[in-house]
Regions:
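C-terminal motif of bacterial Sec signal peptides marking the signal peptidase cleavage site
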Residues: 17-19
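Short, surface-exposed "cap/lid" segments of acyl-processing enzymes
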Residues: 42-102
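Serine-hydrolase catalytic core
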Residues: 58-60, 208-279, 297-307
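Catalytic nucleophile-loop/oxyanion-hole region of alpha/beta-hydrolase
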Residues: 104-137
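Gly/Ala-rich beta-loop-alpha elbow adjacent to hydrolase catalytic centers
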Residues: 139-144, 148
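Conserved hydrolase catalytic core segment
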Residues: 150-164
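Active-site nucleophile loop of the alpha/beta-hydrolase fold
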Residues: 166-178
Length: 312
């Protein structure tokens, strides 16, 4: 996917057009239209473990369950391949959360905050903990990463036991897109950005990204970076690993370094693995126009490592 940002060429025009906030040309084939909502009850029912296993047995409570959080402007589609892997392996469950404001309509997205995005992760975790699941894991891709890191700064996991580990895939703490920093300066002048998608990606991501949500994204990653610089204390019993591609047009690889230095254990460090790939969220291959055997191998290896850690 490629982004196109609508910016005035001459900054002197900013004042003159400050009242402009263009509305994108949305049609009914786009997720932005609200015609293809991922938030309908049937969709949520089959993707959330807390819903489709309403009354877990003791065996199910002892089976690992991983809450999978997708990235900015994406949907649960981003983790479908992990879900299919788990369904085949039958050793763990995947609970695919739809971030608040996502998978609905452009209007819903535009009015959402990063705290609203995060709320679905928190809610599913609390429900699983209350149902007695003893081996809960979290995984987040891209923006799902800082959303999960922010939960580590709260009392959530002390109040609701069960968290055993966290896997972050291409987490964004520093953006590779330097134009993103202009969002705070230009504000309403920016309006929105447009994302170019393959046929296989259409209907799974928002085409248009309102400047209001870009500002929320910047607020989230800026706050997360500051929290990491101060240090975030994590109990030794919670495992954590970051997988980060070395070439990434969305999340700068230095994000992995900041997370490594910022997560504080008493007697260990988090694990970090730099992945030889140019794909952002290399674990999501479906919908891409070009996939190599190396891409497939990296995805399989990562899923197997996650499974092994959860089931050992």
């Amino acid at each position: 996917m490629k982004n196109k940002i609508y910016l005035p060429v001459i900054f002197g025009l900013v004042t003159a057009i400050a009242a402009c906030n263009p509305t994108p040309p949305i049609d009914d084939t786009m997720l932005d239209s609200g015609k293809y909502s991922f938030a309908v009850p049937d969709s949520l029912q089959k993707r959330l473990v807390s819903n489709y296993i309403a009354n877990p047995t003791e065996v199910q409570k002892n089976t690992p369950v991983i809450i999978a959080a997708h990235g900015y402007s994406a949907t649960t589609f981003e983790w479908d391949e992990l879900r299919e892997y788990a369904d085949s392996a039958k050793t763990f469950y995947v609970s695919q959360v739809l971030l608040g404001g996502h998978g609905r309509s452009y209007t819903d997205f535009k009015s959402s905050t990063w705290q609203i995005w995060q709320s679905s992760i928190r809610d599913e975790y609390v429900k699983l903990s209350q149902k007695g699941y003893r081996k809960i894991y979290l995984t987040g891709s891209s923006t799902g990463g800082p959303l999960i890191i922010q939960l580590l700064t709260t009392t959530l996991f002390a109040e609701s036991p069960g968290l055993k580990g966290i896997f972050l895939i291409d987490p964004i703490v520093v953006s590779s897109d330097k134009q993103l920093s202009l969002v705070g300066l230009l504000g309403p002048v920016l309006g929105y950005t447009e994302t170019e998608m393959s046929d296989g990606e259409k209907g799974k991501w928002y085409v248009y990204r309102p400047q209001e949500t870009l500002r929320q994204l910047m607020s989230l990653i800026d706050l997360t970076r500051r929290e990491l610089q101060r240090g975030i204390k994590v109990p030794d019993e919670i495992y954590m690993k970051v997988y980060k591609t070395v070439k990434d047009d969305a999340a700068d690889p230095v994000s992995a370094v900041l997370i490594y230095n910022g997560i504080k254990y008493d007697n260990k460090h988090i694990d970090v693995e730099m992945i030889d790939s140019r794909l952002h969220v290399f674990t999501r291959l479906r919908g891409r126009t070009e996939i190599t055997e190396k891409d497939r191998s990296l995805q399989r290896k990562t899923f197997r490592e996650m499974e092994a850690k959860m089931t050992k």
